[in-house]
């Protein structure tokens, strides 16, 4: 229920932001257009954002015939978590990573790169997929996927402002300084939204995944491997769609500077330390 409230609040906040930006770009007419655009985006994000994200990554659905070991692993973990079987996807990328998407546990999907399957052992891979199923169980996936598409829309709106400027209701050029401010601040607003919803969520998914698999150490060693391998392998699809970075088990972006200020994930070292403490004590609280 709490995630439904957060999702509704996020949609309302994004709608308000769109209206403000629309007003800065085009006055009252811009506000009206922005409101209609935001309502359309809200509808689209709820029903179709998961399909959009999977298409961004050219994810291919697999089954027990095409990826038997991986598919059975997900099915076994979903059973342990008392979840419906999600759709399972593979992404042909060398960078090791994984994510979950969908609007609820009944319409969920999990995806992993071919790179992560090569890098991790079967035990470590179970830890990763248990983490992703914990996101499904906690109903994080709707707000995560909506945030990805909304943040992308904010950036698109900022680019529109930068390249096309705006007109007020009398047809005069809008304040160019306002247009520049929108173009600079909108992506930052999108990044702040992602950061606000992501950090605590990853800790909870680590804990929930450890409970599902019963093996927190496997996720800890998996995170360590992913962190080390991913640092040297660019994830082209993620770099092309940075708004989706917060969906991943590990931040796939390699940029520095301001990008580091908007990191969507807790420090890997802290995540590993918490998991190893769970393994040592046998406690998941």
Swiss-Prot record:
Q: What biological processes does GO assign it? A: proteolysis
What lineage is this protein's organism placed in? Answer: Bacteria, Pseudomonadati, Pseudomonadota, Betaproteobacteria, Burkholderiales
Q: Which cofactor does it need?
A: Zn(2+)
Gene3D superfamilies hit by this protein: Metalloproteases ('zincins'), catalytic domain
Give the way it sits in the membrane. Answer: Multi-pass membrane protein
Main localization (coarse): membrane
Q: What class of enzyme is it?
A: hydrolase
Q: Which family does it belong to?
A: Belongs to the peptidase M48B family.
| Top-rank taxon | Bacteria
Known Pfam families for this protein?
Peptidase_M48 (PF01435)
Residues given in the record as Zn(2+) binding sites: 131, 135, 202
The entry's localization annotation reads: Cell inner membrane
Which organism's genome codes for this protein?
A: Burkholderia cenocepacia (strain ATCC BAA-245 / DSM 16553 / LMG 16656 / NCTC 13227 / J2315 / CF5610) (Burkholderia cepacia (strain J2315))
Q: Where exactly are the transmembrane stretches of this chain?
A: 7-27, 30-50, 146-166, 177-197
Under Gene Ontology molecular function, one entry of this record is: zinc ion binding
Q: How is the cofactor bound?
A: Binds 1 zinc ion per subunit.
Keywords in alphabetical order: Cell inner membrane, Cell membrane, Hydrolase, Membrane, Metal-binding, Metalloprotease, Protease, Transmembrane, Transmembrane helix, Zinc
Active-site residues, as the UniProt record annotates them: 132
Instruction: Please state the gene responsible for encoding this protein.
Output: htpX
Entry EC no(s): 3.4.24.-
Its Gene Ontology cellular component terms are: plasma membrane
Protein name in the entry: Protease HtpX homolog
């Amino acid at each position: 229920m709490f995630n439904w409230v957060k999702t509704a609040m996020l949609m309302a906040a994004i709608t308000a932001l769109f209206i403000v930006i629309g007003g800065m770009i085009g006055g009252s007419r811009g506000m009206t257009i922005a409101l209609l655009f935001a309502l359309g985006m809200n509808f689209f994000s709820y029903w179709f954002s998961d399909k959009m994200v999977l298409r961004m990554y050219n994810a291919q659905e697999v089954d027990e015939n095409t990826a038997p070991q991986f598919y059975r692993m997900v099915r076994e973990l979903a059973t342990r978590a008392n979840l419906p079987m999600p759709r399972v996807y593979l992404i042909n990328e060398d960078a090791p990573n994984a994510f979950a998407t969908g609007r609820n546990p009944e319409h969920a999907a999990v995806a992993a790169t071919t790179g992560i399957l090569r890098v991790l052992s079967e035990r470590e891979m179970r830890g990763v997929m248990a983490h992703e199923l914990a996101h499904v169980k906690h109903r994080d996936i709707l707000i995560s996927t909506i945030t990805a598409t909304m943040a992308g829309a904010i950036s698109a709106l900022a680019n529109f402002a930068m390249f096309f400027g705006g007109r007020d209701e009398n047809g005069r050029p809008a304040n160019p300084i306002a247009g520049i401010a929108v173009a600079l601040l909108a992506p930052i607003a999108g990044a702040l939204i992602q950061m606000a919803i992501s950090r605590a969520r990853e800790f909870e998914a680590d804990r929930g995944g450890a409970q599902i698999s019963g093996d927190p150490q496997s996720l800890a060693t998996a995170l360590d491997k992913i962190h080390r391998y991913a640092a040297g392998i660019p994830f082209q699809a993620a770099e092309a769609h940075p708004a989706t970075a917060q969906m991943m088990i590990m931040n796939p972006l390699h940029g520095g500077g301001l990008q580091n200020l908007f990191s969507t994930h807790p420090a890997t070292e802290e995540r590993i330390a918490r998991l190893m403490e769970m393994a040592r004590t046998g406690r998941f609280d």
